[in-house]
Design a protein with these regions (language model features):
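Short beta-strand-to-loop acidic/aromatic patch adjacent to the donor-nucleotide binding site
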Residues: 93-102
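Short, well-formed alpha-helical segments that are part of the catalytic scaffolds
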Residues: 19-32
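Conserved donor NDP-sugar-binding/catalytic core segment of glycosyltransferases
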Residues: 104, 108-139
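Short beta-strand/loop segment that forms part of the nucleotide-sugar
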Residues: 38-46, 68-70
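A conserved acidic beta->alpha catalytic loop
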Residues: 44-53, 74
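Acidic donor-binding loop at a coil-to-helix junction in glycosyltransferase catalytic cores
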Residues: 183-196
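Catalytic donor-sugar/metal-binding loop of nucleotide-sugar-dependent glycosyltransferases
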Residues: 196-214
Length: 312
């Protein structure tokens, strides 16, 4: 009985879309979590492969699955997760976790997060992960680089599917989502927003060196591992378009960080602002190679960013 009283309750928020190929295996790995009590809340972007029907049937026999009303069209994972954050009742839960539809969780994923968060007095958690491909290739992806002064405005803490948020962080984040204006839907990455909110408002965050899950790579991934030259150049083109810094500005506004010097003098400073950021690259990204690319990107934007996109 004493052991049962120590079990913590986790609300797992899963966004699905045409997920029949991998979804069942993923949900089964979530339901096998050890030493914790879970409830999986699922929001399905309007699908055509029978995802809704399969989940509805499954929920009849599995009380740990809660399905949000079907029928809405979100058009991306971000808006779907915002719907979950807005609509799921988090009262009575100790932690919130995000889940994609096509990965595989380690049986102790949530338990390990809870233990490390308690040890480090952290309220936000993310971790390394293992990317794997249909060919059988697997690769550990390290996200546990030291946090920097402003990294939260330029990158997430890792994939949202590794995140665990204590309720004292999750509930204020939920209030932000519920109260946000239409600009929320312009932020494509719910995980980046969550990390920025936590860091700016001084909620302690820990990034675990342990790989908590297997992150499936396939042709239909909305966001995958940056592997291969094609993927690399797609990201370079997105950087040079100014897209990343536009996302940074939106996030800074939503989390009320717009008064920071990195926003006022850097992101809001036009071409000179990009040079200002370039000189502070080590404070804007965690990983050394990313700091180098950040520096190069800022210099290129200062030189070549089209004037008709504005200074932002």
């Amino acid at each position: 009985m004493a052991q049962e009283k120590k079990r913590r309750r986790f609300a797992v928020c899963l966004a699905a879309y045409n997920g029949m190929v991998f979804m069942v295996e993923q949900i089964e790995s979530i339901l096998l979590q050890s030493n914790v009590d879970i409830q999986v809340f699922i929001s399905v972007d309007q699908s055509i492969d029978g995802t809704e029907a399969r989940l509805a049937e499954w929920a009849l026999s599995e009380s740990r699955l809660t399905l949000l009303p079907f029928g809405q069209r979100f058009g991306g994972a971000g808006p779907n997760f915002y719907r979950l954050l807005r609509d799921v009742d988090l009262s009575g839960f100790d932690y919130l976790s995000f889940a994609d539809q096509d990965d595989l969780w380690h049986p102790e994923k949530l338990w390990r997060a809870q233990c490390l968060m308690t040890k480090k007095s952290a309220l936000g958690y993310s971790s390394n992960f293992t990317a794997f491909w249909p060919t059988g290739e697997a690769r550990l992806v390290n996200k546990a680089w030291p946090q920097r002064t402003w990294d939260f405005l330029f990158e997430s803490a890792g994939p949202g599917c590794t995140y665990v948020l204590h309720s004292s962080l999750a509930i204020p984040l939920q209030q932000l989502v519920r109260n946000a204006d239409k600009n929320l839907l312009r932020v494509d990455y719910h995980d980046w927003l969550a990390y920025a909110f936590a860091r700016y408002h001084n909620f302690p965050w820990v990034i675990d060196t342990w790989s908590s899950m297997q992150y499936r790579q396939h042709a239909h991934n909305q966001i995958g591992v940056n592997a291969g030259w094609r993927s690399f150049w797609l990201r370079v083109r997105k950087i040079l378009s100014g897209y990343g810094f536009e996302q940074s500005l939106l996030i800074a506004d939503l989390v009320q960080a717009s008064a920071l010097p990195v926003v006022q003098r850097g992101l809001g400073g036009g071409r000179l602002g990009y040079l200002w950021l370039a000189l502070r690259a080590t404070q804007c990204r965690r990983k050394r190679i990313d700091q180098m690319w950040f520096f190069i990107s800022c210099v290129l934007l200062a030189l070549f960013k089209p004037a008709d996109r504005g200074d932002a």
